[in-house]
Amino acid sequence: MATGRPATGFGWRVYGLGVVALSLVCLAWGGFDPGQAAPKALPDRAVLAFAAAVFMVVAGAAIEWRRTTAWAAASLTAYYALVVCVLMDGPGLVVSYAEYGSYSNVAEQLAIAAAGLIVYATDAQINAVLAARLTRLGQMIFGVCALFFGGAHFFYMNLTAPLVPKWLPPSQEFWGYATGFGHIAAGLAILTGVQARLASILLTVMFASFTPLVHVPILLVDVRFDLLPGSAGIGFVVT
């Protein structure tokens, strides 16, 4: 039996707006999202980057309109999973398979695909059993991604710690390790289903706190494309 289900909370709206914001910055900068590792020598790279950004604007905006939410989410899922993770980031992962950062970078893009899958499953007019399976698949994928996010904090503490405000006690390293552990704990909870909803909510709060504490202060000094916030919407969707 096909049934329509409301998308998780208001996470689908945050998710859609996040995609739109990211795509608008891509248009302003005239390039791909840094997580989309399109080769520099790619023919007509600027044109393709523009096309990708326009697609993301349209799809992200379509998420906000309930009549097109499901199809827009499906389109974003396919784009991030197949085009970004496989075609763009896949070759780099094969070449740099021994570097942890290669996996965490792919995980960042895969998490966006996982959130799109969950939005699609919870909104589309599809069989309830299939919807539940797709939702769980998206949650499992995101759980694995969270493990990679946490691991990156430990592997690259020399890069993570300086992002923490110096005024935040007890130390930058403490919060670097604490947030890394938080990612891993949340990922395990989501994967096992033990206190998964609580873990997702807390992870969302942590993602959201990164914006005023980490991203905004850095962006005010150094406008870096790769520091644009966008994880909170994904956390909202997973909850």
Specify the residue positions occupied by each region the protein language model found.
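Extended, low-polarity transmembrane helix blocks
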Residues: 1-31, 46-58, 62-155, 174-181, ...
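Membrane-interface interhelical connector segments
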Residues: 28-41, 155-175
